[in-house]
Amino acid sequence: MSKKRLYEIAKELGKESKEVVARAKELGLDVKSHSSSVEEAVAAKIAASFKPAAAPKVEAKPAAPKVSAEKKTEKSEPAKPAVAKEEAKPAEPVAPKTEKVAAKPQSRNFKAEREARAKEQAERRKQNKGNNRDQQQNGNRQKNDGRNGGKQGQSNRDNRRFNDQAKKQQGQQKRRNERRQQEDKRSNQAAPRIDFKARAAALKAEQNAEYARSSEERFKQYQAAKEALAQANKRKEPEEIFEEAAKLAEQAQQVQAVVEVVPEKKEPAVDTRRKKQARPDKNRDDYDHEEDGPRKQQKNRSSQNQVRNQKNSNWNNNKKNKKGNNKNNRNQTPKPVTERKFHELPTEFEYTDGMTVAEIAKRIKREPAEIVKKLFMMGVMATQNQSLDGETIELLMVDYGIEAKQKVEVDNADIERFFVEDGYLNEDELVERPPVVTIMGHVDHGKTTLLDTLRNSRVATGEAGGITQHIGAYQIVENGKKITFLDTPGHAAFTSMRARGASVTDITILVVAADDGVMPQTIEAINHSKAVNVPIIVAINKIDKPGANPERVIGELAEHGVMSTAWGGDSEFVEISAKFNQNIEELLETVLLVAEIQELKADPTVRAIGTVIEARLDKGKGAVATLLVQQGTLNVQDPIVVGNTFGRVRAMTNDLGRRVKVAGPSTPVSITGLNEAPMAGDHFAVYEDEKSARAAGEERAKRALMKQRQATQRVSLENLFDTLKAGELKSVNVIIKADVQGSVEALSASLQKIDVEGVKVTIVHSAVGAINESDVTLAEASNAFIVGFNVRPTPQARQQAEADDVEIRLHSIIYKVIEEMEEAMKGMLDPEFEEKVIGEAVIRETFKVSKVGTIGGFMVINGKVARDSKVRVIRDGVVIYDGELASLKHYKDDVKEVTNGREGGLMIDGYNDIKMDDVIEAYVMEEIKR
């Protein structure tokens, strides 16, 4: 049996909860509050106690509405016969008549209501007129107060404002009282309203009771079935249970087959939603019941109705568009819930550092919440968007029983990986390649002459000053085999170029003049070759000269670690004369022999990789780079990344200036098609397509820029004073333009090494190519001069330089550039002065002149005293004052100087405390040349 609470009974009866609680206590029930629950039978008993007794059923209640209606229509006489009839008739037939009378709806007197509304409207119009008149009077009062002004006017305004507010409040209170009376009157006239809340509560209580009753019955059935099954299992043997289970399974299969053959009739779904209840009729005369009084204008009411209708239409449209509100869907059966599929775990998991929990869950087909729970059990607090390190991911995979492997990400912008990867070359495709030989040595020891002899050309005569300015790469054929030669400059400024030549070479030919012997650049070349473990072949040149001494050269080289094979070393020595082509064949045979011992191999089938030998900017071709192919084959139209630049090989020429389409291993070629000129010594690599090459080149340029920005020097305690001292130095700003990148580097390094105390060189800009207008503009803005090395300014740049007074210095020999720069730096130094004493004098007499000062009469005892010299006043061996002369006279004449043994008078500027026997020392400051 279901139970009811007292407040539910009160709602059903339309009574207050207090009355129901009191009545329950009167009936002897043990209840404490309106929340107490009672059985349904007790609830019915409480409800019956509120109903009237059966005997006095017929009362004046049914006649009450008639009486009230008669009062409205002013007909009160017919009420008496009705009562008399009711009293005269017996009790049984009276009851149905009273029920019929109570069920009749009350009739409304619409005419009286219309008259009442018209009367109210007339009163409101009258009140509005009065309000308008009051507002007009207030405006006139304000105007008068403005004219009057002063404190009296202000007090009058305050009094009137107070009176107006009081009148307004009285009027509002009066209108509120009238509205309350009208509402009471209408409520008496209106039909009784239906209590929808009470009905809804009763319906809900009935549904709850029914649900509780059915639930209790189902629970009892379940308990009974459970007990019966338990008793049956106790009595039966296991074998019997299995037999019964098998029979039940067969019956279930048969039933399932029948169900599949005969489709089940689907009953229409019952709409359990509560139907929308109709709203009660609302009295339309209450819309203007506001404290501010009268209705608004008809125009405003129409606009409000329009907005309200628009909102209602929008709400209805949205309601129609909502899924599930369609009437056609109400009778459809709900779709069955599909079970989640079970996914097997993978056997392997490839991960990267920084993977999030959500990414891991997606890869292993598990929910992120499950992984978060596992991590929590492992002691790791994480969310599904949190990144995990490699160690945590591996521990998580161990928990799942999955083998974890870290994914190796390949950096597409890393060119160096092609040079170190073991799997890049195919071992089966390796073939013999030509050796790359670098010719190194001191200045003017005959390197270029030797290379010229090898190529049977006169390259050396075209070199300015007799020295090689940049690397040349050439290829010759000896006994059917190719040899690639690299010529490096021997001047001290080209150290970086020699280092690059040694890094890409297979064999080094060290040229040493037999008459000069070992020189500084010779030692440097030996160190470069040993640093990269390159075998050295010593070519002792100029043996045709009278002062040649090859044995001395061999001994000097032995002191620096280069031992001849005849002395038990590993270096080959060949005595040659490059000028007269003596023993050149023997030198080439030695080169091929050493190359054969080294077993030089290359794979021509892979994409080409190599090193930049030189780079320059050509006005017609753009960026031109000389490349040495080390592995693979370079073709025209190959997408290529060179250092921090990229492009496509547009054209390719060999060392003879002829166009070629293919360049194999150990072949030097010049290419065009790059977006910028690369740096000498950069590596290059051919990519699969132009898109990947562009991405790699842009990424490398971006990284180089970031690295350059981060390379700012930080001031530490050790270099703080050096930094402060450097701020006081004078600076010579220079812009360098050269024909090739190697010359630019050599010039920059040489100029920055110039040591002149108090002056430093600042390289504002350095680049490859001709001097153009932008260089001149930059020089003018930075107060710099331009140094051109083997380049010339354009006509427009020359005109602009003359107009802007920018100095351009052109050179073809690096010695001249360095000497000229040293002179310019010394010329910027402040002159140094040295003090020189020119004479001494002794004060013999002093004269004080008013408004003039103290005049000292003196005699020169040594040298002279000049008018423009500085003087010191020395008293008892101590310098009292150091200053300048204000005047110098010999008797009454102004003179420029007073010589030894003569007398004169002097005045010292700013000093009047001259005394007898003071020594006046005259001196001048002379400039000293640096």
Curated annotation (Swiss-Prot):
Regions of compositional bias (Low complexity) in chain numbering: 50-67, 129-141, 309-318
Pfam families cross-referenced by the UniProt entry: EF-G_D2, GTP_EFTU, IF-2, IF2_N
Swiss-Prot/TrEMBL keywords: Cytoplasm, GTP-binding, Initiation factor, Nucleotide-binding, Protein biosynthesis
GO molecular function: GTP binding; GTPase activity; translation initiation factor activity
InterPro entries reported in the protein's UniProt record: EF-G-like_DII, IF2_II, IF2_N, P-loop_NTPase, Small_GTP-bd, T_Tr_GTP-bd_dom, TF_IF2_bacterial-like, TIF_IF2
Keyword Nucleotide-binding: yes
Residue numbers spanned by region Disordered: 50-195, 260-346
Domain tr-type G: 432-599
GO cellular component: cytosol
Region span, G1: 441-448
Sequence segments annotated as region (G3): 487-490
Entry superkingdom: Bacteria
Region annotated G2, chain positions: 466-470
Binding site for GTP: 441-448, 487-491, 541-544
Region (G5): 577-579
Biased composition (Basic and acidic residues): 68-90, 110-125, 157-167, 262-295, 337-346
Main location per the UniProt record: cytoplasm
Cellular compartment(s): Cytoplasm
Protein family per UniProt: Belongs to the TRAFAC class translation factor GTPase superfamily. Classic translation factor GTPase family. IF-2 subfamily.
PANTHER family (alphabetical): TR-TYPE G DOMAIN-CONTAINING PROTEIN, TRANSLATION INITIATION FACTOR IF-2-RELATED
Function of the protein: One of the essential components for the initiation of protein synthesis. Protects formylmethionyl-tRNA from spontaneous hydrolysis and promotes its binding to the 30S ribosomal subunits. Also involved in the hydrolysis of GTP during the formation of the 70S ribosomal complex.
HAMAP family named in the record: IF_2_B (MF_00100_B)
NCBIfam families named among the record's database cross-references: IF-2 (TIGR00487), small_GTP (TIGR00231)
Protein name: Translation initiation factor IF-2
Encoding gene (name): infB
